[in-house]
Design a protein with these regions (language model features):
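Catalytic alpha/beta core domains of metabolic enzymes, predominantly
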Residues: 2-123, 134-139
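Short secondary-structure boundary/hinge segments and terminal tails
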Residues: 49-50, 128-129, 165-166
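Mid-to-C-terminal alpha-helical segments outside catalytic/metal-binding sites
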Residues: 146-168
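C-terminal helical cap(s) of enzyme catalytic domains, especially alpha/beta-barrels
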Residues: 17, 129-153
Length: 168
C-alpha cells in the first residue's frame, strides 16, 4: 500500500552515489499510481522536496504527499535543518523524520515536539545509546512512545496511523 520513492540523487559518501533523475522519479510515481501505492517521498535535503513537488505538479505524485525527512546523511541533523524541511512542504502533507545513527533520538524528540511523526528501525539506527545495541525494532518504537507521552503527544493506533497516512 505504501513504498519509498527517493526524490533525488543521494551521495552516501566515498564513491557511493544513488542516482535518481527527474524522469526516474516521474516513472516510479506513475507506476505507484497505476498500482494504487502511496509514495513515501524520502528526501535527504531541501532540494529533494522541491523535486517531489515538481513531480506532483506534473501529476506524477498525488496530493496530499507524505514525506520522510532523512537527516544525518546528505544534510546535517539539527533541529534547524528539521524546521527548514518541515516548513518547506504543503500544509496538507504528512511527514515523518528519521535521524540516521547517532542522530536518531534527538531528531525523534524534535519531530514529536514539532507535531511530526517518527520513523525508527534497524534500517536507520541500531543503537539505543552510545555502544548499546537495540534488542529489536520494538524496543526503539517503545522509546518513541515514551518520548511522545513525555511531550503530551497521543500515540496513534494502527488504524489511526493508516488514516493519518491516507491509507484508510
Amino acid at each position: 500500500e505504501m513504498a519509498t520513492l527517493d526524490c533525488g540523487t543521494c551521495n552516501f559518501g566515498g564513491d557511493e552515489i544513488f542516482i535518481n533523475t527527474d524522469n526516474t522519479i516521474a516513472n516510479f510515481g506513475d507506476i505507484m499510481q497505476e498500482r494504487g501505492i502511496k509514495p513515501e517521498c524520502e528526501v535527504f535535503d531541501k532540494g529533494m522536496i522541491d523535486l517531489a513537488l515538481k513531480a506532483a505538479k506534473k501529476g506524477h505524485i498525488q496530493y496530499p504527499i507524505h514525506f520522510d525527512f532523512v537527516l544525518g546523511v546528505q544534510m546535517t541533523a539539527t533541529v534547524r535543518d528539521l524546521v527548514i524541511m518541515a516548513t518547506s512542504i504543503p500544509a496538507d502533507s504528512t511527514w515523518t523524520a528519521t535521524g540516521i545513527g547517532k542522530n536518531a533520538w534527538g531528531i525523534a524528540a524534535a519531530t514529536i515536539a514539532m507535531g511530526g511523526h517518527v520513523r525508527v528501525g534497524f534500517e536507520d539506527n541500531v543503537y539505543m545509546s552510545k555502544g548499546v545495541l537495540a534488542k529489536s525494532n520494538g524496543e526503539m518504537v517503545e522509546r518513541v512512545v515514551q518520548m511522545a507521552k513525555l511531550l503530551n503527544r497521543e500515540v496513534a493506533t494502527p488504524a489511526e496511523a493508516r488514516e493519518i497516512l491516507g491509507l484508510a
